[in-house]
């Protein structure tokens, strides 16, 4: 059976990996936000919607994102970060408030990636550049952005590629270490995430 065991060394390694991943994604999201604007960034307003603050990775992410935005010239007081509390209606209301406040760019980690079309329509109607992070809208939605030449982008990982990498890591370990009960098979536990969001 393949299982994860806890130890302080592994926990520290995991935390370091999460922090590095959060830093990398925050950097990519900031670059996308900066590319969407021109001129002096110090007076630009940034609205950020996070699906849920209690998610540890997203806590690291939003901290790194804010820090990186400031390092690129945005003022901290012009960056507002909202907690969607894992409720799409709450997040939609926050997005509408950001539109009313006339933010210069909106960064959204959607509660439900299936809501992307509705979110995109609202934000594009207001003429605000939009950056989706971490939870990828479907391919049809991304194709629609290209066809309409909208100022919308997605920054995140390719879930299929991540699965391929995980499989390669397991294969590299080798059967002699993975076949713990000697039956010629690799036993494993599959942990599923949110079916609404494949990332």
Descriptions of predicted regions:
Residues 3-199:
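A residue-level marker of the well-folded mature domains of exported/periplasmic proteins
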């Amino acid at each position: 059976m393949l299982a994860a065991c806890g130890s302080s060394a592994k926990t520290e390694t995991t935390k370091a990996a999460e922090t590095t991943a959060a830093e990398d994604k925050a950097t990519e999201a900031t670059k996308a936000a900066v590319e969407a604007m021109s001129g002096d960034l110090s007076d630009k307003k940034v609205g950020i919607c996070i699906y849920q603050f209690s998610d540890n990775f997203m806590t690291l992410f939003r901290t790194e994102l804010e820090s990186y935005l400031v390092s690129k010239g945005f003022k901290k007081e012009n960056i507002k970060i909202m907690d969607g509390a894992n409720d799409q209606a709450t997040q939609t209301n926050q997005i509408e408030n950001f539109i009313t406040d006339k933010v210069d760019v909106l960064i959204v980690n959607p509660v439900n990636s299936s809501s992307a079309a509705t979110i995109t329509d609202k934000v594009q109607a207001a003429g605000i550049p939009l950056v989706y992070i971490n939870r990828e809208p479907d391919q049809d939605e991304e194709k629609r952005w290209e066809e309409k030449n909208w100022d919308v982008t997605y920054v995140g990982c390719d879930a299929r590629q991540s699965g391929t990498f995980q499989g390669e890591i397991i294969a590299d370990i080798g059967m002699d270490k993975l076949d713990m009960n000697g039956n010629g098979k690799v036993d494993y536990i599959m942990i599923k995430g949110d079916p609404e969001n494949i990332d």
